[in-house]
Amino acid sequence: MKHAMLLSMLAMMLAANAGAQTSPRQLPETANIRGLLLSAIDSKNGTAEAWLTGPMAVKLKNETKAPPNTRVKVSVSTLQVFRPGCKRLRMTLAMPMHKMLTVKGTMEMFQMYYDLNLCRDGQPPQVSTVGLGAAR
């Protein structure tokens, strides 16, 4: 009897542990996109993620006719490093639980992205010398 109870407890612990491993990791919330972009610039792996809150999230949900409880995920990744503190970043805004009708007639998760060049000081990196020469 004790053996069966011990096996049952062990099975419950293993099931609980397996569920914990498959659950999605918790993301922080932010209304500060600039801070998230700077976090990606500073990050060793060049990425940053958070749930977007505040007026920008509300506007995006209103424009896409998403339900009010829909969450907006912001993911920032590095596409290119120009020099220390200056990167080409891709910021993706997505609503994983909100499906929208596409022009092809399929229902797809809402997702859009922006690519931008940014330095830690807030200025764009100089990636080309075109137009910087003296006028003739």
What does each model-found stretch correspond to?
Residues 13-17:
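N-terminal signal peptide c-region/cleavage motif recognized by signal peptidases
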Residues 2-8:
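Sec-dependent signal peptide recognition
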Residues 90-92, 136:
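Long, C-terminal folded domains that constitute the functional core of proteins
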Residues 96-134:
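A short, surface-exposed beta-strand/turn
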Residues 10, 79-81, 106:
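Generic marker of residues within folded, mature protein domains
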Residues 75-77, 92-94, 117-119:
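A structural detector for beta-sheet-dominated domains
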Residues 21-84, 90:
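N-terminal secretory signal peptides
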